[in-house]
Regions:
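Alpha-helical transmembrane segments and their membrane-interface exit regions
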Residues: 1-4, 93-98, 133-139, 181-192
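Long hydrophobic alpha-helical segments that form multi-pass transmembrane helix bundles
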Residues: 1-70
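Hydrophobic alpha-helical segments embedded in the membrane of multi-pass proteins
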Residues: 67-70, 87-96, 126-139, 154-162
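Conserved mixed alpha/beta catalytic, RNA-binding, or beta-rich assembly cores of soluble enzyme
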Residues: 77-114
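Membrane-helix interface "capping/anchor" motifs
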Residues: 77-88, 141-154
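Membrane-interface capping segments at transmembrane-helix boundaries
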Residues: 84, 190-200
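Hydrophobic alpha-helical transmembrane segments in multi-pass integral membrane proteins
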Residues: 100-110, 162-175
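Loop-to-transmembrane alpha-helix initiation sites
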Residues: 124-132, 153, 171-184
Length: 200
């Protein structure tokens, strides 16, 4: 979050996949802005689902390969190192907001059932870009900041998802999930204490 605020011109420009990057001097490597620029201006992405799943687009390192991230998430959940409740509620909240309130031009005012397929494409684009899936696997389940009780984890995921989409829709930084996590982490302890008092 600090690097994004301090150096946005350098932080949010990425080399295209399969670009040869020299070991010592990478200043000559052409970089481009992320696909978040297209989404924030109301456009639709021209990438196939396979390209998005494999991470074949300019994105922060490690956040684009959705299949690898899902495999890592399944491994962590099978080893009991991560709880699914916070991640699933986070992704479900992001998906619902993207489906019912899409950023793409003309879709928000259209009938939901008539334009269900373009809305589902918006959900795909929002979940597979902007480090959303990376955050669901690795950042949401941080044991020291995530709520410890089940209902608290669900509420934690919903709040992080709603604030993330708010930052993505109205903010200037594509990885708004970092700021959403910082915001909700400040009340995660309170959520645990409240749930303990309610069920005690």
């Amino acid at each position: 979050a600090v690097a994004a605020v301090s150096w946005p011109e350098q932080v949010f420009r990425y080399p295209q996949p399969y670009t040869a990057i020299p070991l010592w001097d990478a200043s000559g490597v052409p970089v481009s802005s992320a696909i978040e620029d297209t989404l924030s201006s109301g456009g639709m992405l021209n990438y196939s689902s396979i390209a998005l799943s494999l991470g074949e687009y300019a994105a922060p390192m490690g956040t684009g390969a959705a299949l690898v991230l899902l495999a890592c998430g399944l491994f962590l959940w099978s080893q009991k190192d991560a709880h699914m409740t916070a991640s699933v509620s986070f992704l479900a909240t992001c998906a619902l907001i993207a489906f019912f309130f899409p950023r793409q031009a003309g879709l928000a005012e259209s009938d939901v059932l008539v334009n269900a397929l373009p809305r589902l494409q918006c959900v795909r684009d929002e979940l597979l870009t902007g480090a959303v899936l990376f955050s669901a696997v690795f950042l949401i389940n941080e044991p020291y900041t995530c709520a410890h009780h089940r209902m608290g984890r669900i509420l934690y995921g919903v709040l992080v998802g709603a604030i993330t989409m708010g930052f993505r829709y109205y903010g200037v930084y594509e990885t708004g999930v970092c700021f959403a996590l910082l915001t909700v982490n400040s009340i995660s302890g309170w959520m645990d204490r409240t749930e303990t008092h309610l069920y005690a």
